[in-house]
């Protein structure tokens, strides 16, 4: 097991290096002036050149990348052009809020998706199967930003049960474990959970249906094993894949939360990315993308290790 983990870590290192290169290239090759958020419209050419030198934008791309990679390896992602605050502090605060939102959304999606998937797979080719499958298809198909706006109109604007935006009372940018903060979390978390719910439901449904059609299940029933015992065998066979899908969905939610966080003004990485894009804040933009990409790579590594621990056949293969 330790040898397998060591190999997976070694495989991850070149992936991380490639992620940093792609992140740097995408940000720096995009059109636009990186100093548009700090320079006045009537700024002189001398002032522009001075700012370009200050932020190192006048250097060759390979030199900029080498300096940025060296500093990033030491925990320094530079300073935001728009706010002059360290990128690390900006991103760390936003990542914490996004982790809370994505984790809660993934747990909701996993719970509902597993329930719908098991029910649909166990009662396959029945009305219950068709209903659960229809719900999962709706979850995958509905645009979550549209669903978020619909939920805001119903539960915030019309009924007034839940707050429409923010992470806490008074526009607080920091989340806390109390009822007011939980109320702010409900709408974005439910909205974000719809896609993982649909994907997990379809995956679990296929796994359960496949397991029930295997010969060993018929043999267990012939031996008189109860349905509860058969259910335990089904869980054992579907758990590794279901957990892997859940981990991947958590990674996707971490990186794909920009629309949800913008709709609900949730102060996470998606909201931060949106602001950095419009302000053309290159240090903040590439720092945020890098942190999210590394989170996704490390999360996939953790999922691989967990899946191998649950199913040793993966390691042997």
Segments and roles (model prediction):
Residues 2-4, 13-16, 92-128, 144, ...:
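Alpha-helical transmembrane segments of integral membrane proteins
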Residues 15-66, 159-181:
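Hydrophobic alpha-helical transmembrane segments of membrane transport/permease proteins
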Residues 30, 139-142, 254:
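Transmembrane helix irregularities
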Residues 53-62, 77-87, 168-185, 192, ...:
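Membrane-interfacial helix-loop-helix junctions in multi-pass membrane proteins
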Residues 134-199:
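Membrane-water interface segments at transmembrane-helix boundaries in multipass membrane proteins
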């Amino acid at each position: 097991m330790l040898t397998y983990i060591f190999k997976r870590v070694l495989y991850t290192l070149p992936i991380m290096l490639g992620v940093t290169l792609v992140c740097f290239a995408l940000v720096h090759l995009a059109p636009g002036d990186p100093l548009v958020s700090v320079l006045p419209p009537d700024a002189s050419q001398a002032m522009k050149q001075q700012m370009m030198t200050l932020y190192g934008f006048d250097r060759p791309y390979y030199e900029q990348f080498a300096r940025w990679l060296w500093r990033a390896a030491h925990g320094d992602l530079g300073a935001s052009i728009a706010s002059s605050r360290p990128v690390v502090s900006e991103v760390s605060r936003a990542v914490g809020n996004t982790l809370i939102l994505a984790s809660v959304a993934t747990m909701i999606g996993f719970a509902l998706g597993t329930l719908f998937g098991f029910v649909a797979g166990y009662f396959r080719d029945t009305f219950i199967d068709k209903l659960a499958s229809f719900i999962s298809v709706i979850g995958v198909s509905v645009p979550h930003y549209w669903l978020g706006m619909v939920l805001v109109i119903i539960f915030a604007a019309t009924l007034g049960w839940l707050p429409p935006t923010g992470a806490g009372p008074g526009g607080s940018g920091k989340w806390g474990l109390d009822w007011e903060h939980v109320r702010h979390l409900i709408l974005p978390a439910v909205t974000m959970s719809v896609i993982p719910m649909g994907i997990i439901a379809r995956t679990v449904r296929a796994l359960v249906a496949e397991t029930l059609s295997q010969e060993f299940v018929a043999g267990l029933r012939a031996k008189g094993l109860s349905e509860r015992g058969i259910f335990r065998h089904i869980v054992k066979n579907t758990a590794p894949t279901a957990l892997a899908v859940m981990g991947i969905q958590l990674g996707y939610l971490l990186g794909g939360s920009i629309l949800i966080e913008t709709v609900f003004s949730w102060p996470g990485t998606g909201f931060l990315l949106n602001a950095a894009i419009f302000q053309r804040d290159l240090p903040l933009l590439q720092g945020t993308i890098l942190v999210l990409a590394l989170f996704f790579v490390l999360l996939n590594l953790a999922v691989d290790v967990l899946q191998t621990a649950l199913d040793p056949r993966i390691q042997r293969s």
